[in-house]
Amino acid sequence: MNNDEYLTALGQNAKQASYALATLSGQQKSALLRCIADKLTAAKADIVSANQQDVADAKANGLSDAMIDRLLLDETRLMGVISDIDNVIGLTDPVGSEIDSRLLDNGLRLSRRRVPLGVIGVIYEARPNVTVDIAVLALKTGNAVILRGGKETLASNKALCTVIRSAMVSQGLSEDCVQLIDNPDRSLVSGLLKLDKYVDMIVPRGGQNLQRLCAEQATIPVILGGIGICHIYVDAEANLEKAVSVIENAKVQRPTVCNALDTVLIHQSHAKQFIPVLAKHLSGLGVNFYGCDQTQAILTAEGLDVSAATDESFATEWLSLTLGIRVVADLDGAVEHIRQFSSGHSESILTDNIHTASDFMNAIDSAAVYVNASTRFTDGGEFGLGAEVAVSTQKLHARGPMGLEALTTYKWLAWGDYTIRG
């Protein structure tokens, strides 16, 4: 079987499996997800062992610490993933809900009802937890899914999918509801992007190269996002002591994720006072800096290392313990910088002035905009959506963390009495 035949078979099997999934009741889907959680718990030793193989291979191949952190699925992280399944089980199932209903003048009773999308293709890189997150959300909403993870996590993904597929069978469903492309051949990605006869939506979770590839080659609707060049603006009326803890959380808690902070913008009135305090605190936590001219002068005078910031560095999603710092004249300067360099993911303002906060929220056109909060909150679990499929930075169909509703569409239902159009 060549690659085209292989992908066609995957698509056909997924489409066929999706029909039965779409008819499941909420109770049946909850039972399925509970079965998956129980089987993952029972198989945790095998799953962790498979992940250790991936981690060992990654280290042998010289992958970065950031990449290794992304692919790590130890027992603690795995149990967190399983806990998220419980959260999803507890969420309201949007499928079958009525969006609106009205009686038309022509006598038709017209309504819109939420239904599954059908088959979702997800292409992702070194995050094995995504395998479970996506499968669970897809199944909760009655969708079949075709997964294509990175070669770095192949052993982990195989172990996870084997367990999930066994749960499907034990619940009387086709194992083809969840399929994994386990061949690392890159041409299969291009082929999947053109499988529009069977796949209804593509979600790429990865870096700019993957996003660009999908945007350029797909003949299927693509949800773009996941690239997070995130900003925090420290306003003239910010509480500086509290600001340090927010910035630390946004930058240091988990620097390898898309909602981590990349650039902090500081009002000029605080520059000489606040930048040294912030930099000394963060440098003690391993953070290094790229600064504008004024920031460089301030930090150099304090004996702290700093590299010269450029447009290229400000346009970089660091995914590491690196932070850009820029002094701005006012709110307008902060907004101008964000508009130029943001990826449209998450931005925050720290201020005690409610009017300035409101102006910031109105001016910034990103998927998530915060006042006095860390950008790290842009997450399906934190938003009460359960695990997320992705964080969309586009505006059509879905924006921000994609939970259950983002995996549904709707259809029009019209009831008549042998009604004809006049």
From Swiss-Prot:
Its main location: cytoplasm. It is found in: Cytoplasm. It catalyses: L-glutamate 5-semialdehyde + phosphate + NADP(+) = L-glutamyl 5-phosphate + NADPH + H(+). Keywords: Amino-acid biosynthesis, Cytoplasm, NADP, Oxidoreductase, Proline biosynthesis. It comes from the Bacteria. Pfam families: Aldedh (PF00171). GO terms for cellular component: cytoplasm. This is Gamma-glutamyl phosphate reductase. It comes from Shewanella halifaxensis (strain HAW-EB4). The lineage of its organism: Bacteria, Pseudomonadati, Pseudomonadota, Gammaproteobacteria, Alteromonadales.
